[in-house]
């Protein structure tokens, strides 16, 4: 659903919302939605055509500039948090049912088997060649802890490119704003 007026444009799809105010608001929102869809298709763990899905299935491969940037940042955060931020957690997320909604508490034996897979030190990343490989069979990554922030940052860049001075993006509860909301009615209740 998309609505536009002289002052702004807004689009809501599933749990995502993009709002922009300014002369080029409609085009900015359209470009923002296209970027959200592009990054989602690239970074999704569940879409069989996504780069991350293919990396997880093949244990590595060549990656795009966006994925390379996110992997570099994720590994930096992993190091700076002494491993508390871990992108190699995907096998554990699957076992707990977070990926398909079939939640369960795994038994201790299964968890002990999967825990060694959640270890970013076993990710071999060649920044120059934009390639990655997992040193341990069964490793899989998930950018869920960093991708929405990256995506909303890209939306803010798009807004600025379109001269937008006020806007908002909400991606499944992660919200980023630019400028301030411009009220067009005398009171907020009108």
Where is each model-derived feature located?
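N-terminal cap/recognition module
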Residues: 9-45
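Short, small-residue-biased leader/transition segments that mark boundaries at the very start
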Residues: 1-12, 186-190
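Internal glycine-rich flexible loops
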Residues: 23-26, 30, 42-182
